[in-house]
Amino acid sequence: MMARNVLVSGGAGYIGSHTVLQLLLGGYSVVVVDNLDNSSAVSLQRVKKLAAEHGERLSFHQVDLRDRSALEKIFSETKFDAVIHFAGLKAVGESVEKPLLYYNNNLVGTITLLEVMAQHGCKNLVFSSSATVYGSPKEVPCTEEFPISALNPYGRTKLFIEEICRDVYGSDPEWKIILLRYFNPVGAHPSGDIGEDPRGIPNNLMPFVQQVAVGRRPHLTVFGNDYNTKDGTGVRDYIHVIDLADGHIAALRKLEDCKIGCEVYNLGTGNGTSVLEMVDAFEKASGKKIPLVIAGRRPGDAEVVYASTERAESELNWKAKYGIEEMCRDLWNWASNNPYGYDSSSEDNSH
């Protein structure tokens, strides 16, 4: 059975909006639920445009997942075949300062969603977990069997939600759940119309680089250049957001398989790239020089993290197609057209 009606929580966000577009283009009908805490409704207006005639199969509700009655209303109006759950707060530093905010938002939101899904007989879920659950891995590449641990409250919310999902499946084998552990999503849709638009100071390398390139910040701070890596800077597995979005569609297809329980897949490229290599690729793509300031290591930052991709390749039939050149090219296309993100636009932000 082809999952036709999909609810996407957090669908106005960075990864969510790109996934919603790929879903629409793939023939799905999509209902987005997002409280717009860290996103803009403009992203969905642009998704609708990019989807052309497929755009009419998109609807949006500005709702917080903790608002049970609003969520129940949405589930009673549409019979969903599956849910893709992106919604959650994701700033590591803020999670350390405000742990209860993170636990309340991410855990209570997810538990409410799972309860309402069960109540309405929708037991197919794709959850956006994160490579952060590997903590500081003792070796690489990270396989799905590695022990999981987390270094901050944000990471713990991802880890706890994974455990909750395993317990829900353990209690009721009608559930089919896929946990996707993303590595480091970067880039943007090749149109340059949607992309990453973090509020406040970005936590991740590439949104920071993009803000330096468009003149919003004076320099990039590199945390640690004394790691035991090729150039002393931290190594991560960067993945193009379009590849990541396509991974979610592969996961939805997998949910149609009757033999599935609660499964975990890494979504990465399997290649490690250092901070300096990434900055260099971005400078080439943009023609801009990124001034660097070297600082000490950030506590809790791992040295080298990249994915083992074998399981996703063999079981989801999915493989990342794009390299860092395309990631940087598409990122710059988005950033140069939208230097202030969605606030650069004159589109009405009120609906």
From Swiss-Prot:
Its EC number is 5.1.3.2. Widely expressed. The active site is at Y154. SUPFAM superfamilies: NAD(P)-binding Rossmann-fold domains. The keyword Zinc-finger does not apply. NAD(+) binds at G13, Y14, I15, D34, N35, L36, D37, N38, D64, L65, F86, K90, K158, Y182. Optimum temperature is 35 degrees Celsius. GO terms for molecular function: UDP-glucose 4-epimerase activity. The keyword Manganese does not apply. Pathway: Carbohydrate metabolism; galactose metabolism. Substrate binds at residues 130-132, 182-184, 203-205, 221-223, 236, 298-301. It comes from the Eukaryota. Keywords: Carbohydrate metabolism, Galactose metabolism, Isomerase, NAD. Optimum pH is 7.0-9.0. Disruption phenotype: No visible phenotype under normal growth conditions. Belongs to the NAD(P)-dependent epimerase/dehydratase family. Catalyzes the interconversion between UDP-glucose and UDP-galactose. This is UDP-glucose 4-epimerase 5. It comes from Arabidopsis thaliana (Mouse-ear cress).
